[in-house]
C-alpha cells in the first residue's frame, strides 16, 4: 500500500510543523480542536490531526497517548490512529513485529476493559483488523486465542470487565470483516477461517446467555455479538441453541431489542433456507410470541409489537418457498401467515398509532410469487388454501387505508400526513399486485361491498369506508386493463350516488373516474354519467389537482366522443379560469385538456371556441403590453403566454399523437385550409412582438414567448409552415438584441423540422447565419457568463449538421471560428455544456470528406481539438464525461486516421502532459490502443476510462470500485 505524502502545515498558531508529529504537538492540536472558539483554527487542527494519524510517527505517539494520565479525548485519538494503521497501512509493519504489536494491543484492551468504552472499542477494532490481516496463515487460531487470553485467571481486571472486553472484541471482528478492504481471494480465505472459528465463540455465548448469574449487560452484549457473527453466513443449525436462547430473552424488556436484532439477522441469512428442519422448529417459537404480541398491541407498546412483527416477517418473507414446499406442515405455516395478517391489520392509524403494518407488505408479494411459481397442480391446491387469505388481506388493507376522522386528521402534522400518503400508495401497489392472484373476482367483491354500502338504508355509512373501497378500485384500474370487467358499468352507475362531503373523498372519486377514462372511451354512452361530476368539481379549489387531471384524461382518451359536451366543458373551464380558482400548474393542465377536446371538433367549431376561450386573455395581454414593465404585470404576461403554449401543445387536428394507435382509431378527416392554431398565432403575432419589445431583456418572458412557438411547432409539424418566415425574422431580431438560450432552442426545432424543405431553407439559413454570427461575437466578449447559451448553440450546430449539412456550405459561415469556440466550450465547468460540445464534434468530424470547409478546418485546427480532449481526460474534466470525450477520439480515429496518428504522438510527447503521473510507456500504450480501435466504440470508452484513472492517480483504488 502506498504511503501518503505528509503535507507541511501547522495545527494553528505556534503548533509544530507537519513533520513533527510528536505527543506534545498532537496534544496541542487536540486541545485546539476541542476548545479553540475560532472555527478556522479548528478546521486547521482537524486537517493536521488527520495527517498525523496516517503518518509513520503514529505508531509511536499512539501508545503514549493511551497512558492512564491522559484525558479520554486524547486517549481516544491515540486509539483511533491504531486501526487506521493496522487496516490501511498493514504493509508498513515488518513481519517480525506482528507478535509484539498483538501483545501491545491485548495489554491495552485489558487495561481499558474497566475504562473508557469508546477507547476500548477503537482498540478492539485495531486488534480485529490486525487479526484479519494475519489470518489464516500468520495467526491460524486467532479467535480461540482471544477467548483463551481473556479467560486467563491471572488478569488484574475483574471477570465481568474481561468478559465485556472479550465480547466487544468478538463483536467488532465480523463487523470489521464485512467492511474490510481485503482482496477478494483473501476475503474468501478469512471468511472460511472465521466460519471454522465460530466453534470457539458460540459455546461461550450460549453459556453466558443461559447462565442465570450473567448480568443483563453481559447478556445484552452476548446477543449483539451473536447478531454480528450470524452475518458471516453461519449455517442455521449451528445457531439453533443460541436462537432458542434469544427467543427466551424476548421476555426480558432490557434484552428485547438485542434479541430481535439477533433473531432477525440469523433468520434472514440467504443460506438459511437450506436448513428446513431448523426453520420448521422456529415456526412454533414465532407462533409462541402471539400472546406477547396481543398484549403489546392492547397496551399500545409499539416497540414490542414492531419487534415481534419483524421476526414473523423475517421468517415468512425469507423462507416462504422453502416452508410452502413442506406440504405436511401446511397448517403451521398457515398459522404463521395468519399471524402476519394480524400484524398487517394491527389496530390504529399508520403512522400515528402504529408503525408495524408497513413491514408486512413485501411478505404478501413474496408469498404470492412463490404460490404462482408452482406447477399447475400444486398451484391449484395452494390457491384453494390462500385465495380466502388474500381476500381477507384486501379487506384488511382497505381498512388500514381509511382516513381517520376529520377532527383527528386535523391534528396530524404535515410529516405524518405525508407518511400516510406514501403508506396508502404502498397499499395501492399491493392491491394491484394481488389482482394477479384474485382476478376479476376481486373487482366484483369490491363492487358488491360498495353497492351494499351506498344502497343500505339501515345505517349511515362513513365517507372513509366509501373512499377506501373506491381507492381499491382506483388502484387496480390505474394499472390493470379493466375494459372487459362486467362490474365497471355498475360502478359508473354508483359513483353519482356518492354524497361527497369531504376533499379526500372528492379526490378519490375524481381519480377513480380518471382511472376509468380508457374504459369510458370504449363505452361512450356512460360519459354523461360522470362528466357532470367532474365539471362540478372544477369549481371547487380543494380537489383542484384531481378534478383537472381527470378532465385532462377524459379529454385525451374520449375526445372523439366529446363534441356533444364540448360547449359545456369549454364554458365551465372558461369560468373557473376567469375566477382564478386553480393554481398556475392546474390552469396549464386545464388548457391542455381543452387542447385535446378541441382537436376532435370541426375547424369552424375550433375557431369559434378558440375565439371565446382566448379573447379575454388577448385583451388582457394587449392592456399589459401598453404598461410599463414591473414584476406584477410580468407574472400576468408569463401566465397568459403559458396558457396559450399549453393549449397549443395538445391542439392537434392532424392527430399526430394518435398515429401509433392503429388504423381502427376513429379519426376525423384531415381538414383543408390553414390550421386553427396557425390562424390564432398569426392574429396575435404582432401583439407578441409588441410584448417582446418591452421585455426583451427578461429571460422568463422571452422563454415563455419561445415556448408558445416551440410547442406549436412540435405539435403541428408541417402544418406550422406558413409561420416559418415571420417567426425566423422575429427570432433573428430577438437574438440580435439580447441573445437568449430559448431562442436558440426554438431555432433548433425549426432546423429539425423545416431545414430540409427547399421552400423554407432560405429564411432558416438566414436565421442560422445570424444567430451564429451573434454567438461568435458573444464568445469574443467572454462566454463564461452564458453557459446556457453556449450549450444551446452547440446543440443547434449539431442539429444543423445532422439534419442539413448544407448550412455549413455557406461562405458567410465562419466554420473556423465555430470550431475554435466549440473547443473552448469543451473546457467549461458545466457538464451539460461540455456534453453538447462533444455532441457537436461527433457530428462534425464525419463531415470532413463531404463538406470542404469542415475538412479544411479539421486539418488546420484538429490538433487543438485533440489537445483539449487529452487535457480533459488528463483530469481537467469530470470523470462522468469521459464517454463523451471518448466519442470524439473515436470519430477522429474513424474519419481522420492519418492526422490523428501524427497528432496524438506529438501531443503526448511533452513530459507531464496530460498528467505528471503518467510514464512515457503508459502514454505510448494508450496512443497505440486508440489508433488500433476504429470499429468498437465501447472498447475506446473503456480505454479512456482506464487512462483517465491513471492520469488522476486513482487506478486500482477503492474510489474506482464502481466506476
UniProtKB/Swiss-Prot annotation:
Residues 45-111 form the Importin N-terminal domain. HEAT repeats lie at residues 24-54, 56-88, 95-135, 142-179, 194-231, 236-268, 276-325, 330-372, 375-438, 440-476, 487-522, 524-558, 562-600, 603-648, 676-716, 720-754, 761-803, 815-845, 860-893, 897-931. SUPFAM superfamilies: ARM repeat. Coiled coil: none annotated. One of its GO terms (cellular component) is nucleus. GO terms for biological process: protein import into nucleus. It is found in: Cytoplasm; Nucleus. InterPro entries: ARM-like, ARM-type_fold, Exportin-1/Importin-b-like, Importin-beta_N, Importin_beta-like_NTR, Importin_rep_1, Importin_rep_2, Importin_rep_3. GO terms for molecular function: small GTPase binding. The keyword Magnesium does not apply. Keywords: Cytoplasm, Nucleus, Protein transport, Repeat, Transport. It comes from the Eukaryota. Belongs to the importin beta family. Interacts with UBC9, RAN, RBM8A, eIF-1A and PAX6. PANTHER family: IMPORTIN-13, TRANSPORTIN 3 AND IMPORTIN 13. Functions in nuclear protein import as nuclear transport receptor. Serves as receptor for nuclear localization signals (NLS) in cargo substrates. Is thought to mediate docking of the importin/substrate complex to the nuclear pore complex (NPC) through binding to nucleoporin and the complex is subsequently translocated through the pore by an energy requiring, Ran-dependent mechanism. At the nucleoplasmic side of the NPC, Ran binds to the importin, the importin/substrate complex dissociates and importin is re-exported from the nucleus to the cytoplasm where GTP hydrolysis releases Ran. This is Importin-13. The gene is IPO13.
Amino acid at each position: 500500500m502506498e504511503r501518503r505524502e505528509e503535507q507541511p502545515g501547522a495545527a494553528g498558531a505556534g503548533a509544530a510543523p507537519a513533520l513533527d508529529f510528536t505527543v506534545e504537538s498532537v496534544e496541542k492540536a487536540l486541545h485546539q480542536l476541542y476548545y479553540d472558539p475560532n472555527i478556522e483554527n479548528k478546521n486547521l487542527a482537524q486537517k493536521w490531526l488527520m495527517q498525523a494519524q496516517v503518518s509513520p510517527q503514529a505508531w509511536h505517539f499512539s501508545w503514549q497517548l493511551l497512558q492512564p494520565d491522559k484525558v479520554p479525548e486524547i486517549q481516544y485519538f491515540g486509539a483511533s490512529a491504531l486501526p487506521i494503521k493496522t487496516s490501511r497501512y498493514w504493509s508498513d509493519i515488518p513481519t517480525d513485529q506482528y507478535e509484539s504489536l498483538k501483545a501491545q494491543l491485548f495489554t491495552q484492551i485489558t487495561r481499558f476493559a474497566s475504562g473508557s468504552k469508546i477507547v476500548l472499542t477503537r482498540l478492539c477494532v485495531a486488534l480485529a483488523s490486525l487479526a484479519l490481516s494475519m489470518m489464516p496463515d500468520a495467526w491460524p487460531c486467532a479467535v480461540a486465542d482471544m477467548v483463551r487470553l481473556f479467560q486467563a485467571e491471572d488478569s488484574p481486571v475483574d471477570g465481568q470487565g474481561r468478559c465485556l472486553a472479550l465480547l466487544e472484541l468478538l463483536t467488532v471482528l465480523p463487523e470489521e470483516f464485512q467492511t474490510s478492504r481485503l482482496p477478494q481471494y483473501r476475503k474468501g480465505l478469512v471468511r472460511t477461517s472465521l466460519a471454522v472459528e465460530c466453534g470457539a465463540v458460540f459455546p461461550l455465548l450460549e453459556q453466558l446467555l443461559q447462565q442465570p448469574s450473567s448480568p443483563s449487560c453481559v447478556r445484552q452484549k452476548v446477543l449483539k455479538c451473536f447478531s454480528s457473527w450470524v452475518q458471516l453466513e453461519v449455517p442455521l443449525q449451528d445457531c439453533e441453541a443460541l436462537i432458542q436462547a434469544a427467543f427466551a430473552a424476548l421476555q426480558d424488556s432490557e434484552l428485547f431489542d438485542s434479541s430481535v436484532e439477533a433473531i432477525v439477522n440469523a433468520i434472514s441469512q440467504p443460506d438459511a433456507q437450506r436448513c428446513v428442519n431448523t426453520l420448521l422448529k422456529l415456526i412454533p417459537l414465532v407462533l409462541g410470541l402471539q400472546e406477547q404480541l396481543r398484549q403489546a398491541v392492547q397496551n399500545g407498546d409499539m416497540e414490542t409489537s414492531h419487534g415481534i412483527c419483524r421476526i414473523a416477517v423475517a421468517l415468512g418473507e425469507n423462507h416462504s418457498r422453502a416452508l410452502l414446499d413442506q406440504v405436511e406442515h401446511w397448517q403451521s405455516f398457515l398459522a404463521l401467515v395468519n399471524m402476519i395478517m394480524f400484524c398487517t391489520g394491527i389496530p390504529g392509524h399508520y403512522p400515528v398509532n402504529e408503525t408495524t403494518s408497513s413491514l408486512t407488505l413485501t411478505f404478501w408479494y413474496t408469498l404470492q410469487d412463490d404460490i404462482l411459481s408452482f406447477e399447475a397442480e400444486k398451484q391449484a391446491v395452494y390457491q384453494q388454501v390462500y385465495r380466502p387469505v388474500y381476500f381477507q388481506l384486501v379487506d384488511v388493507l382497505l381498512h388500514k387505508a381509511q382516513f381517520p376522522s376529520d377532527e383527528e386528521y386535523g391534528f396530524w402534522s404535515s410529516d405524518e400526513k405525508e407518511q400516510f400518503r406514501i403508506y396508502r400508495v404502498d397499499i395501492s401497489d399491493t392491491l394491484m399486485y394481488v389482482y394477479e392472484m384474485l382476478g376479476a373476482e376481486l373487482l366484483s367483491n369490491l363492487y358488491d361491498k360498495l353497492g351494499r354500502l351506498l344502497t343500505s338504508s339501515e345505517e349511515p355509512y362513513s365517507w372513509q369506508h366509501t373512499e377506501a373501497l373506491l381507492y381499491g378500485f382506483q388502484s387496480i384500474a390505474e394499472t390493470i386493463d379493466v375494459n372487459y370487467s362486467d362490474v365497471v358499468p355498475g360502478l359508473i352507475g354508483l359513483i353519482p350516488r356518492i354524497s361527497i362531503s369531504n376533499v379526500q373523498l372528492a379526490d378519490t372519486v375524481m381519480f377513480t373516474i380518471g382511472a376509468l377514462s380508457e374504459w369510458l372511451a370504449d363505452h361512450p354512452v356512460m360519459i354523461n354519467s360522470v362528466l357532470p361530476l367532474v365539471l362540478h368539481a372544477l369549481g371547487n379549489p380543494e380537489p383542484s389537482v384531481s378534478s383537472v387531471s381527470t378532465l385532462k384524461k377524459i379529454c385525451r382518451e374520449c375526445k372523439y366522443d366529446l363534441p356533444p359536451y364540448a360547449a359545456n366543458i369549454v364554458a365551465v373551464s372558461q369560468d373557473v379560469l376567469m375566477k382564478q380558482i386553480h393554481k398556475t400548474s392546474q390552469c396549464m393542465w386545464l388548457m391542455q385538456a381543452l387542447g385535446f377536446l378541441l382537436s376532435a371538433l370541426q375547424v369552424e367549431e375550433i375557431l369559434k371556441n378558440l375565439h371565446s376561450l382566448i379573447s379575454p386573455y388577448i385583451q388582457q395581454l394587449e392592456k399589459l403590453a401598453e404598461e410599463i414593465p414591473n414584476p406584477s404585470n410580468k407574472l400576468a404576461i408569463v401566465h397568459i403566454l403559458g396558457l396559450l403554449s399549453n393549449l397549443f401543445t395538445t391542439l392537434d387536428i392532424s392527430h399526430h399523437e394518435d398515429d401509433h394507435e392503429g388504423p381502427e382509431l376513429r379519426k376525423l378527416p384531415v381538414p383543408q385550409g390553414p390550421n386553427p392554431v396557425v390562424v390564432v398565432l398569426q392574429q396575435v403575432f404582432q401583439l407578441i412582438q409588441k410584448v417582446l419589445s418591452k421585455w426583451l431583456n427578461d429571460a422568463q418572458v422571452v422563454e415563455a414567448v419561445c415556448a408558445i412557438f416551440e410547442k406549436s411547432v412540435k405539435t403541428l409539424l408541417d402544418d406550422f409552415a406558413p409561420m416559418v418566415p415571420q417567426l425566423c425574422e422575429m427570432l433573428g431580431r430577438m437574438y440580435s438584441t439580447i441573445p437568449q438560450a430559448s431562442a436558440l432552442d426554438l431555432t433548433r426545432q425549426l432546423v429539425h423540422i423545416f431545414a430540409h424543405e427547399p421552400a423554407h431553407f432560405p429564411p432558416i439559413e438566414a436565421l442560422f447565419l445570424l444567430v451564429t454570427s451573434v454567438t461568435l461575437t458573444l464568445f469574443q466578449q467572454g462566454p463564461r457568463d452564458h453557459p446556457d447559451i453556449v450549450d444551446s448553440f452547440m446543440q443547434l450546430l449539431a442539429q444543423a449538421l445532422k439534419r442539413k449539412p448544407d448550412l455549413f456550405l455557406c461562405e458567410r459561415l465562419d466554420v473556423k471560428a465555430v470550431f475554435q469556440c466549440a473547443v473552448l466550450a469543451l473546457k467549461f465547468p458545466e457538464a451539460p455544456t461540455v456534453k453538447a460540445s462533444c455532441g457537436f464534434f461527433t457530428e462534425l468530424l464525419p463531415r470532413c470528406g463531404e463538406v470542404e470547409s469542415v475538412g479544411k478546418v479539421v486539418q488546420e485546427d484538429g490538433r487543438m481539438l485533440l489537445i483539449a480532449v487529452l487535457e480533459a481526460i488528463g483530469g481537467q474534466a469530470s470523470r462522468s464525461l469521459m464517454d463523451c470525450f471518448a466519442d470524439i477520439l473515436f470519430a477522429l480515429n474513424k474519419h481522420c486516421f492519418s492526422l490523428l496518428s501524427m497528432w496524438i504522438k506529438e501531443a503526448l510527447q511533452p513530459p507531464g502532459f496530460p498528467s505528471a503521473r503518467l510514464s512515457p510507456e503508459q502514454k505510448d500504450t494508450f496512443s497505440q490502443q486508440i489508433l488500433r480501435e476504429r470499429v468498437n466504440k465501447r472498447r475506446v470508452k473503456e480505454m479512456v476510462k482506464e487512462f483517465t484513472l491513471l492520469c488522476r492517480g486513482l487506478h486500482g483504488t477503492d474510489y474506482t470500485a464502481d466506476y
